[in-house]
């Protein structure tokens, strides 16, 4: 049986504002239209700070419904989670945001545990340990998913640097820990990194972890964003696993405005929220089954490559796969016809 939310938001462009394009690119508007908007799902957000999340109007509904929970500030700042960097604010907004006609996120009805693990003003390997501590706490709360819009490769102390050969899922501590979290049944979603244009070029840790969804960035036409990190992993696995919007993606700024920006920091939570909605529809499925359906639904699933991975998922097709419905039965699942599954061929 499917576990749907009561219909409380229209799944149509005007109502979603700038949140419509990332939703429809993944076919997740269809899930929202069925009432699957993340209710009952718990998402841990491990990031660099959540400035003004306790005040911004876009999070008012989630606050009033007590769906935003303070996890931990791994750096033990007296100022607290809501006084530091705005990166986590923007990331959270792409999922949890609910500001009708301006921006509605991909999982506006989910619960969120917030964790500050990243020191946005310096880069040291201890931040990977902060992430591990937060992930352990998130696991203890029973989160279903974890979003990590962070990536580690080069540090302020160059003796700490990772190398491309380290990206095997077993070397960087944060990648080891994310693999363990996935093995424990958490669906871990992380950004592929923004090093595609740099000398580094590849994904960054923990995108090399095993059993996760690392997410690269595409534009609105489904084309690879030049900054999005490339695969494969050091041990030859397809990376990133999938793609989502990361070019001119809408997000809430800590000053209350809605802005648009680029980065796999946006593509990861956009996909994470949509994944939560899919899992809401199939609560009996495991994280691994949800992950496999998402990868199998992507438009390059049978011909993956090092820039787009398996491509852009289609949550409608993932839904059909989880419901054990083949393509011949697709029309009975709800969409009017199967040509809704087609994507533009990225160039």
Residue ranges and their predicted role:
Residues 30-72, 76-127, 141-144, 156-158, ...:
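Subtilisin-like serine protease catalytic core
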Residues 136-168, 191:
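Short acidic, glycine-rich surface-loop motifs adjacent to enzyme active sites
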Residues 45-49, 72, 94-98, 110, ...:
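Active-site-proximal beta-strand/loop segments in catalytic clefts of secreted hydrolases
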Residues 92-95, 113-119, 144, 202, ...:
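Hydrolase catalytic cores
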Residues 47, 207-280, 284, 317:
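Extracellular S/T/G-rich loop segment that most often corresponds to the catalytic His/Ser-adjacent loop
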Residues 323-331:
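Short, compositionally biased serine/threonine- and acidic-rich segments at solvent-exposed termini, linkers
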């Amino acid at each position: 049986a499917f576990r749907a939310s009561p219909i409380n938001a229209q799944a149509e462009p005007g109502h979603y504002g700038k949140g419509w394009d990332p939703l429809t690119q993944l076919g997740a508007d269809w899930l929202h239209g069925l009432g699957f908007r993340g209710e009952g799902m718990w998402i841990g957000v491990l990031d660099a700070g959540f400035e003004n999340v306790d005040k911004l109007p876009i999070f008012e509904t989630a606050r009033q419904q007590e769906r935003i929970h303070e996890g931990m500030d791994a750096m033990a700042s007296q100022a607290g989670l809501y006084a530091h960097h705005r990166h986590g604010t923007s990331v959270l907004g792409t999922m949890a945001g609910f500001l009708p006609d301006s921006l509605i996120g991909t999982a506006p009805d989910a619960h969120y545990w917030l964790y500050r693990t990243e020191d946005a003003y310096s880069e040291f390997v201890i931040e990977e340990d902060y992430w591990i501590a937060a992930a352990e706490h998130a696991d203890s709360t029973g989160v279903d998913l974890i979003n990590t819009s962070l990536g580690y490769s080069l540090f302020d102390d160059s003796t700490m640097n990772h190398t491309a050969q380290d990206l095997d899922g077993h070397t960087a501590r944060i990648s080891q820990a994310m693999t363990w979290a996935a093995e424990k049944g958490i669906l871990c979603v992380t950004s592929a990194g923004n090093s595609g244009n740099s000398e580094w070029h590849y994904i960054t840790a923990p995108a090399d972890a095993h059993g996760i969804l690392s997410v690269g960035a595409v534009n609105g036409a489904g084309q690879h964003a030049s900054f999005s990190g490339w695969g494969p992993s050091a041990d030859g696995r397809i990376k990133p696993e999938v793609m989502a919007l990361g070019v001119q993606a809408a997000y809430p700024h800590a000053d209350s405005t809605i802005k648009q920006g680029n980065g796999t920091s946006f593509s990861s939570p956009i996909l994470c929220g949509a994944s939560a909605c899919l899992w809401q529809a199939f609560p009996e499925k495991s994280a691994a089954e949800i992950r496999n359906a998402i990868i199998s639904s992507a438009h390059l699933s049978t011909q993956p490559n090092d820039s787009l991975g398996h491509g852009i998922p289609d949550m409608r097709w993932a839904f059909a796969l989880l419901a054990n419905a083949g393509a011949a039965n697709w029309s009975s699942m709800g969409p009017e016809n199967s040509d809704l599954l087609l994507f533009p061929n990225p160039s």
